[in-house]
Amino acid sequence: MESTAADPASKVYAYEAGKRALEAHYKRMGIQAEVEMTKRPGWYRSQVKIKGQPLISIIIPNKDHVKDLELCLSSIDKKSTYRNFEVLVVENNSNHPETFEYYEKMTRKYSFVRLLTWKEGFNFSAINNFAAALANGEYFLFLNNDVEVLTPNWIQEMLMLCQQKDVGAAGAKLFYPDDTIQHAGVVIGLGGIAGHIFCRASGSADGYMGRLVSVQEYSAVTAACMLVKKEDFLLVDGFDPEFVVAFNDIDFCMKLGQHKKKVVFTPYAQLYHYESKSRGMEDTPEKQLRFKKETLLFEKKWGKELAKGDPYYSPNLSVTEGDCSLREV
């Protein structure tokens, strides 16, 4: 006689009971949500009903790279099913005349776009803070100019999380052009200060314990695509301008954590990120000095947290490899 335990599909009744249990939980809590089974037996997807149609301010810093920016804007326009948004493109230190020619066409083509100009030197934190102060939305969606929207409901998937009272930020699943993973959450201490877990894993993989296909909390997510409540952004005083290039989004998420706000990753908001896999190499003395300075600043500010280890990552797993393999003793 064969055991039904060997075949998960034979226990459909148990999974249906699990679905009903989740639905009953939401009903008791007064949360309007739909629950559906996933392809993984015993794993469920909950979709919380969005309240109203709040204005989303999408903030995109830009320097030249008009082809990247146009692809980003056109994908937002053509694919997004959530339409109550504005886009703030923040021009900063562009050098090419064609960039400014494009801006004129851009504002005529996309009625939802506003062009802002940052007149000082590059500082990712300061640029985004500047735009946030001029934004009209109840939520800020920080977005890189080199991304392309893949899933039409990308905004809703993050918004349904951010509308929950205890959630401060939501991040998306980002892919390299070859469909490998670029971002699926950030682990503190991975590779030194912090790193993207599952980076370069197959885009079709489920990941360790299904982490690539599950909504879950992380210590941080990348600001290449991150949705934040305006009130929570103000609560932590935005991005810290001392982090000019590196660690600004990690620091921001850690500050949210200090205020008992959750940072959540969703695999259901998906975008391409056309960042070269070799990008970010500190290949000049100036860049190396700046990176070292920001590394020391992060270590000074978050030394206790680094020493404790990431609360969302097992101490038995490697912090030198990003694949959740076992840590070497």
For the regions a protein language model found, what residue spans apply to each?
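A short, conserved alpha-helix in the catalytic core of glycosyltransferases
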Residues: 1, 22, 154-158, 212-237, ...
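C-terminal, non-catalytic tails of nucleotide-sugar-dependent glycosyltransferases
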Residues: 10-53, 168, 178, 190-217, ...
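Cell-envelope/extracellular polymer assembly enzymes that use nucleotide-activated donors
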Residues: 54-59, 86, 251
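Short, acidic, metal-binding catalytic loop of nucleotide-sugar glycosyltransferases
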Residues: 74-84
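A conserved acidic beta->alpha catalytic loop
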Residues: 91-102, 120, 148
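Glycine-rich, basic loop-to-helix element that forms the pyrophosphate-binding segment
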Residues: 118-135, 153
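Short aromatic/hydrophobic "clamp" motif used to bind/position activated sugar donors
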Residues: 140
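Conserved donor NDP-sugar-binding/catalytic core segment of glycosyltransferases
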Residues: 147-193
